[in-house]
Curated annotation (Swiss-Prot):
PROSITE patterns: STAS. SUPFAM superfamilies: SpoIIaa-like. Coiled coil: none annotated. This is Anti-sigma-F factor antagonist RsfA. Positive, redox-sensitive regulator of sigma-F (SigF) activity. When reduced binds to anti-sigma-F factor RsbW (UsfX) preventing its binding to SigF, thus activating transcription. Belongs to the anti-sigma-factor antagonist family. NCBIfam families: ant_ant_sig.
Length: 128
């Protein structure tokens, strides 16, 4: 998997996790499906890190969580850690979820400032 390539592709990241990586100008969008838990945390971390590296400031890294059936705390921690790293180089990490519980969890964990949650990919891309 090479998220620096132009276009969009789907890759089975693990048995429980699938992801589509899409380039939108200099932004990168991850569409995650399935489950993220301790069993595939390192795979998730590798995917997020590579996608972040392929994102060019000032465009964002957008992570669409709408296709997830389960997201463990470890997945949120990976996103928060990468958001802090991205912020240092001028890249925002923006989440997409229609599930209000996701925003509540992000805020309860204290990550609301670094992981804003948007209702659509389009709104995440256009946010300032």
């Amino acid at each position: 998997m090479n998220p620096t390539q132009a276009g969009s592709f789907t890759t089975p990241v693990s048995n429980a996790l699938k992801a589509t990586i899409q380039h939108h100008d200099s932004a990168v969008i991850i569409h995650a499906r399935g489950e993220i838990d301790a069993a595939n945390e390192h795979t998730w971390q590798d995917l997020v890190t590579k996608a972040a590296a392929a994102t060019t400031a000032p465009e964002p890294l957008v992570v669409n969580l709408n296709g997830l059936d389960f997201m463990g705390c470890c997945a949120v921690a990976v996103l928060a850690h990468e958001a802090e790293r991205c912020r240092r180089r001028g890249v925002d990490v923006r989440l997409v979820s229609r599930d209000r519980a996701v925003a509540r969890i992000i805020h309860a964990c204290g990550y609301g400032d670094v992981l804003p949650v948007h209702p659509t990919t389009e709104s995440a891309l256009s946010a300032t």
